[in-house]
Amino acid sequence: MPLVVVCGLPSSGKSQRTEELRRALASEGRAVYVVDDASVLGAQDPTVYGDSAGEKALRAALRAAVERRLSRQDVVILDSVNYIKGFRYELYCLARAARTPLCLLYCVRPNWPSRELREASASENRDLAVSVSWRPRAETGGKSQAAGAVEEQRATSPVANGGVLAAVSKELDPEEILPSNPSAVMTPGSEKSAEPASCAFPPEVLESLALRFESPDSRNRWDRPLFTVVGLEEPLPLAEIRSALFENRAPPPHQSTQSQPLASGSFLHQLDQATSQVLTAVMEAQKSAVPGDFLKLPGTTEPLRFTRPLTLAELSRLRRQFISYTKMHPNNENLPQLANMFLQYLNQSLH
């Protein structure tokens, strides 16, 4: 089934849009798999985007995870920055090789990452970055907690950077408040962890990603169909995405994405034998030839025009080239004509 590539800068709403799309497709009974940075790293690590070697390894891990999941039965959603068009082209080739459609979901946050928005987002995340542990009232005998403990339920924002923070249950009392890790919050029913707070990305990493970001272009075949959503208020174009994923025909495979036919052992043996015999015959025939003659070799109908003395090294190099090309397009029907085909190749290559 199709591949959905989600791209955009950190804190642009990618994880929230991914979860929204996952829920919509899962409600139709479809199997949906989400691949993100945390699922391949084991834990969210924003600093990996500041290290070229680590980022390269991350892209390789994401590509491998997508390739393992990609099939004609399941929907795969890749939730990552995906800011390099070359990497998006690799994903396009994966989908094309699997003969399954692909679409791109581009999440945009206006004026991000500006300094003012970063400071405001960091302030909001500091207010939300608390972890509450509870103890049932029965264990405390219904008594109030120690001094300084919070007695009233504190409702948190339902959405923070695409992750869902569960409300505190009325049956439990807070016991202590400790710093938390926002990336550890899991979305119910999802296989992926929530996107980390934007303050987890150092400002220099955000600015570097913004400068390096290669925006999708619908004129590129690997970037279309392209769906752009601005902010979190704009509704997700679910109808158009469904049409692109399930109604469009998958792109046909071409030579770079389809498996080459396997050549039989006898074909390769006869190819090697025929070209070797031609080389031996040419080296012997040119001993009595003068420039301008046409060499007639035994067992062939194609003459070889003799223009200058040929060395064994030059003929061996052309023979290797011919064998490499012929192995890519094996055809048992050409077995009787291998020697003539090699002579035609020599006539075109020799000057």
From Swiss-Prot:
Gene3D superfamilies xrefs: P-loop containing nucleotide triphosphate hydrolases (3.40.50.300)
Gene Ontology terms for molecular function: ATP binding
Binding site for ATP: G8, L9, P10, S11, S12, G13, K14, S15
Record key words, sorted: Acetylation, ATP-binding, Nucleotide-binding, Phosphoprotein
Matching InterPro entries: KTI12/PSTK, P-loop_NTPase
PTM-bearing positions, type N6-acetyllysine: K143
Region (Disordered) residue spans: 177-197
PTM-bearing positions, type Phosphoserine: S157, S198
Protein family: Belongs to the KTI12 family.
Protein name: Protein KTI12 homolog
